[in-house]
Regions:
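Juxtamembrane segments of multi-pass membrane proteins
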Residues: 473-594
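Hydrophobic transmembrane alpha-helices and their membrane-interface caps
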Residues: 315-362, 792-840, 873, 900-903
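Transmembrane alpha-helices and their membrane-interface boundaries in multi-pass membrane transporters
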Residues: 335-336, 352-367, 388-408, 412-454, ...
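Pore- and gate-forming transmembrane helices of large, multi-pass membrane proteins
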Residues: 290, 319, 371-408, 770, ...
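Signature of alpha-helical transmembrane segments and their immediate interfacial
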Residues: 1-41, 432, 436-437, 441, ...
Length: 975
């Protein structure tokens, strides 16, 4: 190994100009491939392609251009006070204060009634503004597929009696019949009026239950909130929400249209939210934070270098070496991978903080060697032999964490791990090689500058404070261990924050609007999609989820599909019978009998009474097409939209939601079809059969089974049962019981932003702890290979393991929680934490004096760790709380590892090797063996260096040597 390094160093440094030209050519090529790098903003491609949610999401994107909407929210400036009371009511609801919520809602209602004319006028202005905007949006065919803001609800209004539950329609008949009987009595010339009371039937309690059908108010054409203070325009874009570049252009275009409309002249203002806007804002806050973070990181590193080296020349050399390493890394990435993603785009600042460490270690050791020998090539070689091997060991342990990440299912993490792995090794090599070339050229052209690399006597001599600090290692170790145990006591109390909202920018407008929509409309503005192949399957899914099963009712609000607009056929038949009865009841009523205010309802009553049962083919296209693919789509199928009760930031509830609806196993024969068949047998008599009925009496089950086993295909079709369902019934009969009929199922998967985010959470949860353990295992293997012994490997792990314990304990103490982002810091902290132990152990084995070892390597360890710390702590400048939490955890973790490495590890090394017997009996670490100690070809250059005093082997002493002496243990051993 020594011969290889020696020949390589000679080849590079004896021809520094040629080496520099080769380096510049290599940098030029790297720069060329770096410019070809692009950022792939399609986050969908980062998830496992075979994941069911990803597969279905791709299908939805192909069918309708992506799930979700870009939502434009129109509101007016409320000068009367209703809105302020509503806001307080919504907050009280979130806080669980039911009494305050009711009080504020009542106050809001009172304000509206008090200023009814004002709010009516504001409602009209909102609707006029929506008409104006919708026309402009629809004209932009590049970005907008369609806009949902207003619907022709006459189809639903005219067929309202068929949508009512049969028992509710029966109740309406009772009230109508009572009124008719009263009016008939009043028309009798012999009627005697005994009281002034008059019965006026009120149907609001019944009608209000059906006011919102398929998430729409059937009595108002516009997509407006019940309080009439917010109107939504749901824009279905032509592209996918996971394409960030498309999101940006869409957002810019929509906001330009709104701005040019000058809505503010009418007192209306617009807000923006929805799947597309939320995804864009989250990405932009992440990327927007990188520039100030990068600047702060670079400035902090430069300041620390100036503080430790106090020479701008050293800073310039190290920063050029760092720049070269980064450029080569990105050049390799451009050549082999070709693109960065939203995760790997931040890797530059991380590698910058990591890479500068190796340059600092090189420069500190080179100055020490050059001061002793004043032979340039020999000094560089000795630096590489000793510190270089330690740096290689450090680089391999650091990359262990990244290697583990490279096997992640999430491509964002895996590509991050791959780039960070070779990037760390490339930068480690360039920090040594490029810095060495720069020094060689500098001293070749400006020999007088050699004095700036020499250490003065104070820099070579351990201070009295340092000797005193390490003079009582037992006491020092005891104090540090007690402090660690104190903080470690709190470690089990650390909490995991599943609230994904705490990762976002605080008070972001799009997120706040998302909340407000949920409050005002009592719905989620981010529906998920279930894609099925056939119309029969879409009916079965709708039936399975309507009503929502009790076990998932906490996560799912409602499903919306074509079948929301088609009541169960059995219910339609039962309701038609009741309508016939009402018609019969009304025969005695003549228009002349009715008062003027009653007579105006007569035309609508006639429409209601004449309505006929219908099937899905009669549903207007403006309702039906939203559940089908667009004409140009290669994918065919049917969509059922699922409205959740949770949002992206409800981490725990989100996983419950994913577990409930991520994959569904749905019976092919729906309840509504079974109950339609049962109703057709006549067993209900004058009664009715509930469409969602699941349990049957013995007589009902016998009648249903008889029909299932005997009805012809034509009979089933006459009941509006779809052909595919009929084929399923005929294929599997005869049936022994209803459970058998319901046992034939198919599986579905749910797609959408919630599903994708839930998949990411599951990947992090599954891989996080395993990544930590595997990284720890790889680190131990690397240490054993380099140390050639088990005990020193364990000792070097002390700063790491105790540092993590202190980190977690300190987090619990200050109330900092783990989350889905900062948990990934720990595998990285492993790599950072271990390198301090490596440098200290190597130097201790070389000098055999812990005080001298810490005097020489301590400043380098502190400088390199602080530069790393600056890189990570720059994340504290980010507005996005996820990045902010990463910065906090990394800062605490790296600082804890550094403090323990500077205190506890030296004390333990001194205690463990105090007798020197164990040290001499152990195998010498790689880089310090006999073969590395002898190189006769270099001895000829020794006279050119400063006189070297022979240094006898000494134990710990208070004697301060003026010139650092190189210990030649290997020669002693070779004897």
């Amino acid at each position: 190994m020594r011969k290889f390094l020696s020949k390589s160093t000679d080849a590079v440094l004896t021809r520094p100009v040629t080496s520099s030209i080769c380096l510049l050519i290599f940098l030029f090529v790297s720069a060329f491939y770096t410019t070809r790098l692009s950022i792939n903003s399609n986050n969908l491609e980062l998830l496992p392609p075979e994941n069911p949610s990803v597969v279905i999401t791709r299908k939805v994107i192909e069918m309708v251009g992506g799930s979700g909407f870009y939502t434009v929210v129109l509101k007016f400036k409320d000068e009367k006070g209703m809105t302020s009371h509503l806001v307080k009511a919504f907050q009280a609801k979130r806080d669980g204060n039911v009494d305050l919520q009711k009080k504020e809602l009542d106050l809001a209602d009172a304000e509206k009634r008090k200023h009814l004319a004002y709010y009516k006028e504001r409602e009209k202005v909102l609707k006029r503004s929506s008409e104006k905007l919708a026309e402009l949006f629809l004209a932009d065919k590049e970005f907008v597929r369609f806009v949902s803001y207003r619907y022709n609800v006459s189809f639903l209004q005219d067929r309202l009696p068929l949508f009512l539950k049969t028992e509710d329609l029966s109740e309406i008949r009772k009230r109508v019949k009572r009124k008719i009987e009263e009016e008939v009595e009043r028309a009798n010339p012999f009627f005697i009026k005994l009281t002034d009371e008059e019965y006026n039937p009120d149907f609001n309690d019944i009608i209000s239950k059906y006011q919102r059908l398929a998430k729409r108010d059937i009595f108002d054409e516009y997509n407006i909130s019940p309080d009439k203070g917010m109107l939504l325009l749901l824009i279905k874009p032509t592209g996918s929400f996971v394409d960030i570049d498309f999101d940006k252009r869409l957002d810019q275009r929509i906001q330009t249209i709104v701005k040019e409309s000058h809505l503010e002249k009418d007192g209306v203002y617009a807000g923006y939210t929805g799947t597309y806007k939320l995804n864009q804002d989250d990405y932009e806050t992440l990327i927007g934070a990188l520039k100030p973070i990068g600047i702060a990181s670079f400035a902090g590193i430069a300041f620390l270098l100036l503080l430790f080296f106090r020479n701008p020349l050293f800073i310039a050399m190290l920063l050029f070496s760092l720049f070269s390493g980064l450029l080569i890394t990105f050049g390799i990435t451009g050549f082999f991978i070709g693109e960065l993603n939203s995760i790997t785009s931040i890797i530059g600042s991380i590698l910058m903080g990591l890479g500068i460490d190796y340059g600092i270690q090189f420069l500190y050791r080179f100055r020490e060697e050059f001061t002793k020998k004043q032979d340039l090539i020999r000094s560089i070689k000795d630096t590489i032999y000793h510190t270089g091997v330690a740096s290689l060991s450090s680089a391999l342990t650091t990359t262990s964490a990244f290697v583990v990440l490279s096997f992640s299912e999430f491509r964002g993490f895996s590509e991050f791990g791959i780039i960070a792995t070779y990037g760390t090794l490339v930068i480690a090599v360039t920090m040594y090689a490029v810095t060495a070339i720069q020094i060689t050229l500098l001293l070749k052209w400006f020999p007088r500058l050699s004095k700036v690399f020499l250490l003065n006597e104070a820099q070579q001599t351990p201070s009295r404070i340092l000797r005193k600090f390490y003079s009582r290692p037992g006491l020092l170790a005891t104090v540090v261990v007690l402090a660690v145990l104190f903080l470690g006591f709190f470690a089990p109390k650390v909490e995991f924050d599943v609230n994904g909202r705490n990762l976002l920018v605080e008070n972001q407008e799009s997120v706040n609007l998302y909340d407000e929509i949920s409050d005002r409309f009592d719905i989620s503005s981010d529906p998920q999609a279930i894609v099925v192949n056939t119309l029969e399957e879409s009916e079965a899914v709708f039936d399975y989820m309507n009503p929502v099963p009790e076990e998932i009712s906490g996560s799912v609000d409602q499903v919306v599909s074509l079948w929301n607009f088609v009541p169960p056929y059995g219910q339609q038949l039962a309701n038609r019978k009741i309508l016939d009865q009402i018609s019969k009841d009304m025969k005695p009523v003549k228009p002349a009998f009715l008062k003027p205010e009653q007579r105006k309802y007569l035309p609508k009553a006639k429409v209601f009474l004449s309505v006929k049962p219908y099937g899905y083919r009669e549903v207007p296209d403006y309702f039906a097409t939203q559940f089908k693919e667009i004409p140009t789509s290669k994918e065919k199928g049917h969509i059922v939209f699922l409205y959740p009760k949770v949002a992206l930031w409800h981490g725990g509830k989100l996983l419950e939601f994913f577990a409930a609806v991520g994959q569904l196993e749905v019976p092919k024969i729906s309840r509504r079809n079974l109950n339609t068949i049962l109703y057709s047998t006549g067993i209900a008599g004058k009664g009715f059969i509930e469409p969602s009925k699941e349990t049957y009496s013995k007589s009902e089950e016998r009648a249903l089974l008889a029909a299932l086993n005997s009805y012809t295909k034509e009979k089933f079709l006459s009941l509006k049962i779809l052909p595919g369902t009929v084929e399923t019934i005929l294929e599997h009969r005869p049936y022994k019981n209803v459970a058998q009929a319901r046992s034939y199922t198919f599986k579905t998967s749910t797609a959408g932003s919630l599903m994708l985010f839930a998949n990411l959470i599951l990947i992090v949860q599954k891989e996080g702890f395993a990544a930590f353990l595997i990284t720890l295992f790889l680190v131990i293997i690397v240490l054993i290979l380099f140390y050639r012994a088990f005990l020193p490997a364990v000792l070097s792990l002390i700063p790491l393991l105790l540092g993590i314990l202190v980190t977690v304990g300190f987090m619990a103490l200050i109330g900092l929680k783990l989350n889905f982002m900062n948990v990934l810091v720990f595998p990285v902290v492993i790599g950072y934490g271990i390198q301090n132990g490596i440098y200290i152990y190597y130097r201790f084995r070389e000098d055999h004096d812990i005080v001298r070892a810490m005097a020489m390597v301590g400043p380098a360890v502190i400088a390199s760790t602080l530069t790393t710390l600056v890189g990570w702590s720059a994340l504290l400048l980010a507005d996005q709380r996820g990045l902010h939490s990463i910065g906090k955890v990394a800062t605490i973790g790296i600082a804890a590892c550094l403090l323990i490495a500077l205190t506890l590890l030296p004390a333990i090394l001194e205690l463990a090797y105090r007798s020197r017997k164990s040290e001499e009996s152990e195998t010498v670490p790689l880089g310090l063996g006999p073969e590395e100690a002898e190189e006769p070809t270099l001895e000829a250059k020794i006279p050119e260096a400063l006189p070297i005093q022979p240094k006898p082997r000494i134990a710990k002493s208070d004697v301060k040597p003026k010139i650092p002496l190189k210990k030649k243990i290997p020669k002693k051993k070779s004897k």
